[in-house]
Amino acid sequence: MSRYMNPSYRSLKPYVPGEIPRDRTFIKLNTNESPYPPSPGVIAAFTADNAKLQRLYSDPASIDLDRAIAGAVRVRQENIMATGGSDEALELAFMAYAADGIAFADETYGFYRVLADLHDLDTRIIPLRDDFSLNPEDDYNLGRMIVIANPNAPTGLYLKPDVIEDIIRHNPDHVVVIDEAYVDFGNESVIPLIHKYDNLLVTQTFSKSRSLAGARIGFAAGNAALIEDLERLRNSRNPYDISRQSQLAGVKAVEDAAYYRDLCVRIVRTREWTMRQLKALGFTGTDSCANFVFVKHPDFPGEVIAQKLREKGFLIRHFNKERIKDYNRITIGTEEEMEALVEALREITGHDKNS
């Protein structure tokens, strides 16, 4: 670190992304990307927007993309703001609404803590129960902004809309942000509640269910006044946050919703199959409602499982945190990838069919 670094940031602990392999080929099950390609319409959008157009700035308001998303989730365009991934929407919310502080679970998306530290926010950590479920009453009347990942990461646990609504009702003077990065895997969104509660902000991403992690597309949904707040901040820091090609691809992804719904059904089916196989090998875990499983084995530390799988050509996500150090988060890949993973785990745990 240089001597010129702002003292406010010298102790900052940046977010640590999942490993991106560069020197060999792995089956990559560590960052919850879709194992399937984008829809044909999206692929065509990427090839159609030729190099000549790249000399022009993208639409800073992302009007076409906002309109498409609004139609898909059945709200007015004024209730939607497309962003450069849902992480941008989350950061803008932290900037806009956490003057009194921020609250989130002890085991959740690690970027929340990074954003809180980056913006020097008064942070309250809400401990989850022993089974990693959230006690809704722990989020009542906190006097600060609340952010909840639903389904949660890395646990995959899901809170039904009536539970979320109860939390919103008990925090009428502060914004409640619901991060729905994994909502498409068989769960119900709370976006319809934005018409009932002016303090509800919902974020989603195109990185998981829509096979567009590399395009960096997300959005925020909320009361028109909340969206105006976020737009004011966005346009004060990075008005051209979504590239031309990403905006075109995002519109096509929304139009090709049936293609992505089928992929989500396929991923959920593979997730359930994978969990049955892992239980047969002695693993236990949460009842995940996302595109990953969160599991541990009684005889092998989580770090050992992750390392042995890496040696066999698989990348999964191990978190070096005391409470979850025995667990690993494993992204659901294709059927063939998960069959190969289960076979590798049979060998690691001593359940090899040939032994």
Region spans (language model):
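N-terminal "arm"/small-domain region of PLP-dependent enzymes with the aminotransferase-like
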Residues: 1-56, 142
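PLP-dependent aminotransferase class I/II
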Residues: 61, 199-279, 283-286
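Short acidic capping loops at alpha-helix termini that bridge into adjacent secondary structure
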Residues: 76-80, 101, 180, 198-199, ...
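Active-site phosphate-binding strand-loop segment of PLP-dependent enzymes
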Residues: 128-184
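Conserved PLP-binding catalytic core of the aspartate aminotransferase-like
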Residues: 268, 280-312, 328
